[in-house]
C-alpha cells in the first residue's frame, strides 16, 4: 500500500509520507534549541544532507599520481619566432606545480628569443651611418655622431660657422650712429635739416620750470584782461550805434508826418 498515491483534500496542507509507511506527517525540520542553552550542531546525522565527497589532491599524503594514471591533455601554445607562428605542445610532468613553471619558462624563453630577433644592433660603432638607425642608443652618444654628419664648408671661417660669433648679443639694439658702420659703395641717407628752435621750449621749461610757469600765468591773465577791455569797448560802441540809429529813424518819421500835414493843408484851401 506504500506504493499507492496518497490522496490529498483541498484546503489541507500536504505532507509527504515518512519512511516506508504511507502515513502523512510534517517534514523533518530541526527544532530551535530551548532558551538558555547554546546552539549546537543541527542534526548532523540527517540522511537528507549527506556529507560531501572528499577529492584527494596533490597536497594529500598519498603523494603525486603515477605516470600511468595521468590523463591530463597536452597544452598547446602559439610561439612567435621571427614573424612565423608555430604550435608547440607542452606536456605536464612532475606534478601539478611543476607544469605551470615549465610552461612559463618556455614561454619566456620564446618571447625573449622573439624580442632578440627584432632588435637592431650596430655592428660597427665607428660607422655613424648605421649607428643612427639603432633604437637603444642614448642621446649623449648619438649627439656627436649626428654633428659629425654635418658637412662644413672649409671656406667659411670659424666666426661665420658659429652663430653666436656671427650675431652678437646686442645685434638687435638700434645703432646710434649709422655713418661709421655704413657699408661702402652705398650713399648714406640724406636727413632733413635740423630746425633751429627744436627743443628750445622743452629745455627752457626743464631749466627754469617755475619761472616759466609764472610768466605764462601772468601772460594769460594780461591777455584775459585785454580781452575783457576790448569786449567792454565793443559793447559801448554798439550802444552808441543803436542810439544813433534810433534818432535817425525818429527824425525820418517826423519829416514824413510834417510833409503829410502840409499837403493836407494845401488841399483844404
From Swiss-Prot:
It is found in: Host cell membrane. Changing residue 49 to F: No effect on tyrosine phosphorylation and viral ability to transform human T-cell. GO terms for cellular component: host cell plasma membrane; membrane. The keyword Mitochondrion does not apply. Transforms host T-cells, inducing T-cell lymphomia in the host. Activates at least SRC and LCK tyrosines kinases, thereby activating signaling pathway transforming host T-cells. Human T-cells transformed ex vivo display a IL2 indenpendent growth phenotype. Residues 27-41 have a biased composition (Pro residues). Residues 1-127 are annotated as: Disordered. Residues 158-167 are annotated as: CSKH/LBD2. It comes from the Viruses. The chain crosses the membrane at residues 247-267. It is a single-pass membrane protein. Residues 1-246 are cytoplasmic. Phosphorylated by host LCK, SRC and less efficiently by FYN. Residues 61-74 have a biased composition (Low complexity). Keywords: Host cell membrane, Host membrane, Host-virus interaction, Membrane, Oncogene, Phosphoprotein, Transmembrane, Transmembrane helix. Changing residue 136 to F: Complete loss of tyrosine phosphorylation and viral ability to transform human T-cell. Residues 186-195 are annotated as: SH3B/LBD1. Homodimer. Binds SH3 domain of host LYN, HCK, LCK, SRC, FYN or YES. When tyrosine-phosphorylated, binds to the SH2 domain of host LCK, SRC, or FYN. The modification Phosphotyrosine is found at residue 136. This is Protein tio. Residues 91-101, 114-127 have a biased composition (Polar residues). The keyword Transmembrane helix applies. Residues 1-12 have a biased composition (Basic and acidic residues). Residues 268-269 are extracellular. The SH3B/LBD1 (SH3-binding) region binds LCK SH3 domain and CSKH (C-terminal Src-related kinase homology) region binds the kinase domains of LCK. Both motif are required to activate LCK.
